[in-house]
Design a protein with these regions (language model features):
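A glycine-rich helix N-cap at a beta->alpha junction
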Residues: 81-88, 173-179, 446-459
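Glycine-rich ThDP/TPP pyrophosphate-binding loop and its adjacent helix/strand module
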Residues: 47-48, 104, 110-292, 481-522
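Non-catalytic terminal/interface segments that mediate subunit docking, oligomerization
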Residues: 312-436, 442-450
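A short, small-residue-rich loop immediately preceding and capping a beta-strand
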Residues: 20, 56-57, 109-111, 141-159, ...
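Cofactor-binding active-site loop characterized by glycine-rich and histidine/acidic residues
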Residues: 30-172, 385-386, 414, 418
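A short glycine/serine-rich beta->alpha loop
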Residues: 2, 16-25, 53-61, 104-116, ...
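Flexible glycine/proline-rich, aromatic-decorated loop/lid segments
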Residues: 196-202, 258, 390-392, 441-458, ...
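A short, hydrophobic C-terminal helix/tail in secreted or cell-surface proteins
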Residues: 523-527
Length: 527
């Protein structure tokens, strides 16, 4: 049965890519057994309640393989992904764009495509789960108890952002993060031996990860056993799965020719014969749907129903936390923040806006227990520290100060993952000139409609003693050019409060706060 279902995934991908005359069939054909194992053996999802906050998360970091995800969602009963939608793959207005888009297609947990960011966002999801579990879980009430899974390819591990984020995840011991490495030795330009020869598992062991190895990427039982071993490790896990790109396409498998182009009619016919798939394009045997109904849909629905009953009992046993949880489940902040919560700013009050920002964010932190964030090793310069808290780590999971280290890009992507998870308000800080390092993540914040707040300080030539490398010049224009990003450059303490209020009440727009170290005075004209 499993072989039939895996081939169904493969040929949904092949046929949709052929029809659109565009796409990446190789990863779909090679990674289909991994996707099948995750959805039918491991993950708890409910297509009837796709935004269930305690669902297992799945991030296809190798977003060019989007038809793998769309095929899995279709077979798992997600209504957005009908056969007709699969036939519209990569077409204008469809639910099946070339790369997965969060908020556009139900069942997609993250917008991916820029390689490596999917891994980093998954790190954020795992950290969000850990924080929320630490705050809300009680004995007998595992309200937040799920895993975050990733399928990533060689290209993802070449990108620096995955290295930054993975180093951080190992430090944090995020043991509910499991990354499956689609290790096929091929990239778009040829073989990875020409550009990428390091021992990835050894690198991840140095990060503090558990690693597993599956020699045969078609062996579902071995893949499943590796996942079970990963779950017992107490660490984030990397599972290297050796696959053949384009598995089953006899003349193209194992080559870069199957990476980024349709198989075409002749090779598709040969693959059908080679894999014993005797079905017309987009024709799926009823046994495949039955397999997914029993092992994905019904299993997920049962898990969801059990969880709903648990939440109802929890609200009775812990009414105060239950009230916060109820708001989170409605898509709201645990506690509502109002502009009147800020203290009044007196006329004539002089303060640098970075200091005004610290005052404001501490007022917010005192009111909203699910507001947290940090800085890329500049907390005391960016003034991003929550004064009532210590640093968050594996032994202090409830603390709300996050020390991201000098990892600006990963910080932004991790914040995106935390926001994608739901239930949290998050922020991160660095020098304004280093917004260049984080801008790719800021762009994904905007594309995904995530209300992440970026605190950029030292916006002034007054940092001139550091030299031109640290003087932001073109950066404001660059941020303002990003659609769906609110950029605030407040002039004094009052405007800084107003900017923070807009940031923490935003529903679907990220915010960039551009702040200085110079004194600014509030006067009556500001009122």
């Amino acid at each position: 049965m499993s072989n039939l279902s895996v081939n169904a995934i493969r040929f949904l991908g092949v046929d949709a890519i052929n029809q659109s005359n565009s796409g990446h069939p190789g990863v779909v054909m090679g990674a289909a057994p991994m996707g099948y194992t995750l959805f039918t053996r491991q993950m708890h999802v409910n297509p009837e309640v796709p935004n269930w906050i305690n669902r297992d998360r799945f991030v296809l970091s190798a977003g060019h393989g989007s038809m793998l995800l769309y095929a899995l969602l279709h077979l798992s009963g997600f209504k957005d992904l009908s056969i007709e939608e699969l036939k519209q793959f990569r077409q204008w207005g469809s639910k099946t764009p070339g790369h997965p888009e969060f908020g556009h297609t139900v069942g997609v947990d993250a917008t991916s495509g820029p390689l490596g960011q999917g891994i980093a966002m998954a790190v954020g999801m795992a950290q969000a789960e850990r924080f929320l579990a630490s705050r809300y879980n009680k004995e007998g009430f595992p309200i937040f108890d799920h895993y975050t899974y990733v399928i990533a390819g060689d290209g993802c591990f070449m990108e620096g952002v995955s290295a930054e984020a993975s180093s951080y995840a190992g430090l944090q011991k995020l043991d509910k993060l499991i990354v499956l490495y689609d290790s096929n030795d091929i990239n778009l330009d040829g073989e990875t031996k020409d550009s990428f020869t390091e021992d990835v598992r050894a690198r991840y062991e140095a990060y503090g990860w558990n690693t597993e190895f599956v020699q045969d990427g078609t062996d579902i039982e071995a893949i499943n056993a590796a996942i079970e071993s990963a779950k017992a490790s107490g660490k984030p896990s990397l599972i290297e799965v050796k696959t053949i790109i384009g598995h089953g396409a006899p003349n193209k498998q194992g080559t870069n020719g199957v990476h980024g182009a349709p198989l075409g009619p002749d090779e598709t016919a040969a693959a059908r014969e080679n894999l014993g798939w005797n079905h017309a394009p987009f024709e799926i045997p009823k046994e495949v749907y039955a397999d997914f109904k029993e092992n994905t849909v019904d299993r997920g629905r049962q898990a969801y129903d059990t969880w709903v009953a648990l939440v109802d009992e929890y609200k009775q046993s812990y009414p105060e936390l239950g009230s916060e949880l109820a708001r989170i489940l409605e898509g709201k902040d645990a506690v509502e923040f109002q502009s009147s919560d800020f203290p009044a700013v007196e006329n004539g009050y002089s303060q640098a806006t970075r200091n005004s920002s610290q005052d404001a964010l501490n007022v917010i932190a005192d009111k909203v227990p699910t507001f947290l964030g940090g800085s890329a090793d500049l907390a005391h310069s960016n003034m991003t520290y929550i004064k009532s808290e210590g640093l968050q780590d594996d032994e202090h999971r409830l603390n709300r100060n996050i020390q991201f280290g000098v990892r600006e890009f990963a910080m932004g992507a991790i914040l995106n993952g935390m926001s994608l998870h739901g239930g949290l308000r998050v922020y991160g800080g660095t020098f304004f000139v280093f917004s260049d390092y984080v801008k790719a993540a800021v762009r994904l914040s905007a594309l995904q409609g995530l209300p992440v707040t970026y605190v950029f300080t030292h916006d002034s030539i007054a940092v001139g003693e550091d030299g031109p490398t640290h003087e932001p010049i073109e950066h404001l224009a660059g941020l303002r050019a990003i659609p769906n990003l609110n950029v605030y450059r407040p002039a004094d303490a009052r405007e800084t409060q107003a900017a923070w209020y807009q940031a923490v009440t935003s529903k679907s727009t990220p915010t960039a706060l551009v702040l200085t170290c110079l004194l600014y005075t509030s006067d009556a004209a500001d009122e």
